[in-house]
């Protein structure tokens, strides 16, 4: 059908829609699809709110996937039903009640009690939504509605403007402050449970009721990109907090069917996908860095805790956003892929998220390295459906490989929706999806002072946590992580086939003053201080490939009474530990370096090939911990025959001793502890770690590493594969020889020279205190008779300058 009209004729949008036409050239109109016109004529489509509610329910609960014949689903259903039944039974319903559940009585003066109460109602709603439940009765519906009404009048909805004033005044108090009032509960904790409940029981409430219940959110959390509004100190949210607050506002707008709020929420969420700037200070330091580091609370490496929360939040949000008219940020996928590849994957080994990235979460009994890794895998599986085909296949292989790498725990126990369980079952039974082989990977996170190394051939992973002016040695707030003193002060981690070593009560029963890799003071009295950073800036590392790295830490303890230069060299199948300049300003306390602090777990310990359990201050060339499984074996060759002390002893502890909110049940483990004492005349150490070797093979390794230089400010080692690795801690020029050819290191920095052929060395150099530019590398390092070629600078803060020395 074709129409011709005169130029003066006017056609309204409605006329066009009724006629089903659209303007073409020369004033001619042609018949087209009416819906296309509606889209073209309207700036933004109206969101399909029903579809969005269903998407949220599918991602987070998956009721339509429930199969009572699936044992994991039935287990979850029974647990959810039982908990909800008990909560309904225990709920206070009498008139004049002051609270709804015992244990959460002080709703107005303890905000966590308010959040816990709303969370209890959410748990009931979760059970009632399941079609197979026996709880979806008129009586229970009335109970839930009455409970929400009561809470609105007596807690979250009670004079919110007045409450903000009270919270703001309390927040600025220096004395007499109520520390039980937390902004998080008003802006994230409570509204998260409230909005979930209203979506779960959407058909039980009128639109007016739902809007009434969500109205306080606008007072406590008016903006989708800000936190601390409830305490009068609104600031831009970052990282996990930004995901959480934008998620709350997105759910609020779905409930209220508010398109403008939806756009703002999604715009706020999109701000998550940015990198922290190099010049950032204070809270601006929170978030992901280009080298994959994730910092929270300004100076704490937190990929394995807040980073995991962020990733899970993204996995909840992205499927929703893709169903809205505002899904136009395809670059988010690229950024997210980088975070997963560089940020998360190097920190996961055999279904375990390395504790060096979990901050104070290590002090929570039920929040383990396995549960953190399981959450990452669950998130990857969700995200795979929202990614391109190649990324989808990649993530599914990663998840399958991780789940099958450790049988000591059940991944499905950590899945909290039927759709997650269904996805996992489909993945694990899909023979077309293969597993990945073991990974050879070396990752240096210079922006959070962490290193991880995965050795493919020997099937082990090594981790290192350090401290500097930018990175705290540990975090202890809210009564958590009370003994984390040295966890970020040079502690080394060895992950092998003993998959339960760290997550099975290690942080409760280990001697926290004797952590492997650390140098501490004997009889040290440790105090909790606000600033847990070092004042040192020379901390970091460089790698030349995925097998060789040089790492250094200019070290001082918390009290600044102990200093040392501590170097760590990763050389393929071995890790070299070198220390010098170990000095205590307190003559009453001698320094001690802990070489090993390992659960005995079926190990037999040998010193110089002689079985022992205790040896006090004896000269030794080697220590070997032998297991019935060669992959679990751990060997140490000493480079200067030091006096070593070995102990085998039983340690007991309680989770409550490291986290006030945890249980006080006593736990017991046996440990082997290997230490070296220092003095003014014995102020250095040098040893080599060899994981996963038989005792006979270990013996053949005794001369593989040579100490070239072990001076106060200059460390260089050589291995028999023609690799030289070193650290220059001073600004002075230092020299060493390679086959009678002089190498000059003219500036501070970590460096590696790896022989490529008779005429060429592959090299890398990094100085954490300066800009690492390829243009002036000649002023940093040189080798007589060799010229520098093939210079390039890493695009991230990981590797420094790569170059070749060519004859």
Curated annotation (Swiss-Prot):
Active site: 241, 297, 306
Cellular location(s): Secreted
Reaction equations catalysed: [hyaluronan](n) = n 3-(4-deoxy-beta-D-gluc-4-enuronosyl)-N-acetyl-D-glucosamine + H2O
GO molecular function, one term: hyaluronate lyase activity
Principal EC category: lyase
Pfam annotation, one family: Lyase_8_N
Alphabetized SUPFAM superfamilies for the sequence: Chondroitin AC/alginate lyase, Galactose mutarotase-like, Hyaluronate lyase-like, C-terminal domain
Keyword DNA-binding: no
Xref: InterPro entries: Chondroitin_lyas, Gal_mutarotase_sf_dom, GH-type_carb-bd, Lyase_8, Lyase_8-like_C, Lyase_8_alpha_N, Lyase_8_C, Lyase_8_central_dom
Coiled-coil features, chain-numbered ranges: none
Residues of the signal peptide: 1-40
Keywords: Lyase, Secreted, Signal
Source organism superkingdom: Bacteria
GO cellular component: extracellular region
Entry-linked CDD domains: GAG_Lyase
Entry EC number(s): 4.2.2.1
Key word Protease present: no
Biological process, per Gene Ontology: carbohydrate metabolic process
Main location per the UniProt record: secreted
Family from the record: Belongs to the polysaccharide lyase 8 family.
Protein name: Hyaluronate lyase
């Amino acid at each position: 059908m074709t129409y011709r009209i005169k130029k003066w004729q006017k056609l309204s949008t409605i006329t066009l829609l009724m006629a089903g036409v659209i303007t073409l050239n020369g004033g001619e109109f042609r018949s087209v699809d009416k819906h296309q016109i509606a889209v073209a004529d309207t700036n933004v489509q109206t969101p399909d709110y029903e579809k969005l509610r269903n998407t949220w329910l599918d991602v987070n609960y998956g009721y339509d996937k429930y199969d009572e014949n699936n044992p994991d689903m039935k287990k979850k259903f029974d647990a959810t039903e039982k908990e909800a039944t008990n909560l309904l039974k225990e709920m206070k319903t009498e008139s004049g009640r002051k609270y709804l559940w015992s244990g959460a009585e002080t709703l107005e003066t303890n905000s966590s009690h308010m959040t816990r109460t709303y969370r209890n109602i959410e748990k009931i709603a979760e059970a009632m939504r399941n079609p197979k439940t026996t709880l979806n009765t008129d009586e229970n519906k009335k109970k839930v509605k009455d409970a929400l009404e009561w809470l609105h009048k007596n807690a979250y909805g009670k004079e919110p403007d007045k409450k903000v004033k009270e919270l703001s005044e309390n927040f600025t108090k220096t004395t007499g402050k109520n520390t039980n009032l937390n902004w998080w509960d008003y802006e994230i904790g409570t509204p998260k449970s409230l909005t979930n409940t209203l979506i779960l029981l959407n058909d039980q409430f009128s639109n007016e009721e739902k809007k009434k219940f969500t109205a306080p959110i606008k007072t406590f959390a008016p903006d989708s990109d800000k936190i601390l509004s409830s305490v009068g100190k609104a600031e831009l949210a970052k990282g996990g907090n930004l995901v959480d607050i934008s998620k709350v506002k997105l759910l609020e707008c779905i409930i209220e069917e508010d398109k403008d709020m939806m756009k703002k929420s999604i715009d706020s969420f999109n701000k998550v996908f940015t990198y922290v700037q190099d010049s950032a200070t204070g809270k601006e330091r929170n978030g992901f860095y280009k080298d994959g580091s994730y910092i929270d609370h300004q100076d704490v490496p937190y990929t394995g805790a807040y980073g995991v929360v962020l990733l899970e939040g993204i996995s909840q949000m992205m499927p929703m956003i893709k169903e809205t008219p505002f899904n136009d940020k395809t670059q988010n996928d690229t950024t997210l892929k980088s975070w997963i590849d560089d940020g998360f994957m190097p920190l996961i080994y055999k279904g375990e998220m390395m504790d060096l990235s979990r901050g104070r979460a290590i002090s929570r009994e039920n929040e383990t390295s396995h549960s953190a890794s399981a959450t990452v895998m669950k998130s990857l599986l969700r995200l795979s459906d929202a990614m391109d085909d190649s990324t989808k296949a990649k993530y599914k292989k990663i998840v399958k490989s991780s789940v099958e790498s450790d049988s000591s725990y059940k991944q499905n126990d950590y899945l909290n929706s039927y759709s997650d369980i269904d996805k996992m079952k489909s993945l694990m039974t899909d023979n077309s999806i293969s597993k990945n082989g073991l990974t050879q990977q070396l990752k240096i996170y210079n922006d959070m002072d962490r290193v991880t190394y995965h050795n493919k051939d020997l099937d082990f992973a090594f981790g290192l946590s350090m401290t500097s002016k930018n990175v705290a040695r540990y975090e202890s707030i809210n009564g958590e992580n009370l003994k984390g003193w040295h966890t970020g002060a040079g502690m080394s981690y060895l992950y092998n086939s003993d998959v339960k070593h760290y997550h099975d009560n290690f942080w409760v029963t280990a001697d926290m003053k004797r952590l492997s890799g650390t140098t501490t003071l004997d009889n040290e009295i440790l105090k909790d201080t606000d600033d847990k950073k070092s004042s040192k800036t020379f901390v970091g590392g460089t790698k030349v490939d995925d097998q060789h790295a040089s790492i250094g830490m200019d070290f001082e303890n918390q009290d600044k009474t102990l200093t040392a230069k501590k170097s760590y060299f990763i050389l393929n199948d071995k890790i070299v530990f070198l220390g010098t300049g170990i000095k205590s300003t307190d003559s009453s306390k001698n320094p001690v370096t802990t070489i090993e602090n390992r659960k005995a777990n079926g190990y037999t310990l040998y010193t110089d090939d002689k079985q022992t359990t205790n040896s006090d201050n004896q000269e030794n060339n080697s220590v070997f911990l032998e297991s019935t499984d060669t992959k679990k074996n751990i060997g140490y060759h000493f480079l200067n025959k030091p006096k070593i002390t070995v102990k085998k002893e039983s340690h007991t502890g309680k989770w409550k001793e490291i986290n006030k909110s945890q249980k006080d049940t006593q736990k017991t483990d046996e440990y082997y502890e290997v230490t070296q004492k220092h003095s003014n005349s014995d102020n250095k150490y040098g040893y080599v770690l060899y994981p996963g070797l038989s005792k006979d093979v270990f013996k053949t390794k005794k001369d593989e590493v040579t100490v070239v230089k072990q001076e106060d400010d200059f460390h260089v080692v050589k291995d028999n594969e023609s690799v030289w690795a070193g650290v220059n801690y001073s600004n002075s020029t230092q020299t060493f020889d390679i086959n009678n050819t002089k190498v000059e290191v003219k500036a501070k920095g970590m460096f590696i020279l790896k022989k490529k052929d008779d005429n060429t060395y592959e090299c890398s150099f990094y100085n954490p205190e300066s800009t690492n530019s390829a243009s002036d590398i000649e002023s940093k390092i040189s080798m007589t008779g060799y010229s520098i070629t093939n210079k390039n600078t890493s695009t991230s803060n990981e590797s420094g300058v790569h170059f070749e020395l060519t004859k």
